[in-house]
Amino acid sequence: MELQFLGTGAGQPAKQRNVSSLALKLLDEINEVWMFDCGEGTQRQILETTIKPRKIRKIFITHLHGDHIFGLPGFLSSRSFQASEEQTDLDIYGPIGIKTYVLTSLKVSGARVPYQIHFHEFDDKSLGKIMETDKFVVYAERLAHTIFCMGYRVVQKDLEGTLDAEALKAAGVPFGPLFGKIKNGQDVELEDGRLICAKDYISAPKKGKIITIIGDTRKTSASVKLAKDADVLVHESTYGKGDERIARNHGHSTNMQAAQIAHEAGAKRLLLNHVSARFLGRDCRQMEKDAATIFENVKMVQDLEEVII
């Protein structure tokens, strides 16, 4: 499981940072990639990665500001050509209005996509658990931005315990159907009368990962709720230390506020993104150091950076 940041800037493209988009790579888990936001130029950023567009099966939009959605029509059109050998349907999750935006853009431009797009739109009344599969659950809450904006919490369901094959061999259990029964939790009796208890040969379930992705927002308790005990919290950091007033006025957060959220939520790791173009390399390093005074395990991410979860 990996996160790859396709765009880490705020507002408009800059020389060092493109606008918002990140990919959650779940290739080992379900052979899919989930994208969060799709700002202008996202498909160009994807070309710099190993991501195959047809593997992107779900897109989660935080809100409808242009720096988070202007890349969608182009990406959806290009996905048609790049997925010509294997067309795969696509689910788009986001605030009410995302369906109208996408379909209008495709209609006006005369674009046709040879795959199905399934839209899932949300407002205040329909948030909470918004999606569930056999391996993942996704939750969403409203944040505190200048327009309706959502944050997402991706929860991997606990992984089944693994079978200790070597211990079974040592116990004289013949390889074959009995292994399968024990793996499924069944106790088995051997020919010599010994009872093999499945629980003695299966490890405890492994807790699944939690990834929280916070869209544009002021400091809010909703972010703490979404980030509770998260393995990774991705939080916007449009502004720096001392910019709290301007951040609040524009519906954004500072690096220090993001660190406070991570601390209050008990998150394990904080990744700062959505950085104003006025902050260059040295500034970003200082923002990271400042945030670390509140939450130590923090990193300011760069475009195309990959983070293993």
From Swiss-Prot:
Signal peptide: none annotated. It is an enzyme of class 3 (hydrolase). Coiled coil: none annotated. Zn(2+) 2 binds at residues 67-68, 216, 274. Keywords: Endonuclease, Hydrolase, Metal-binding, Nuclease, tRNA processing, Zinc. The active site is at residue 67. GO terms for molecular function: 3'-tRNA processing endoribonuclease activity; zinc ion binding. Its EC number is 3.1.26.11. Transmembrane segments: none annotated. Zn(2+) 1 binds at residues 63, 65, 145, 216. Its cofactor is Zn(2+). It comes from the Bacteria. It catalyses: Endonucleolytic cleavage of RNA, removing extra 3' nucleotides from tRNA precursor, generating 3' termini of tRNAs. A 3'-hydroxy group is left at the tRNA terminus and a 5'-phosphoryl group is left at the trailer molecule. Binds 2 Zn(2+) ions. Belongs to the RNase Z family. Homodimer. Zinc phosphodiesterase, which displays some tRNA 3'-processing endonuclease activity. Probably involved in tRNA maturation, by removing a 3'-trailer from precursor tRNA. NCBIfam families: PRK00055.1-3, RNase_Z. This is Ribonuclease Z. It comes from Streptococcus pyogenes serotype M5 (strain Manfredo). The gene is rnz.
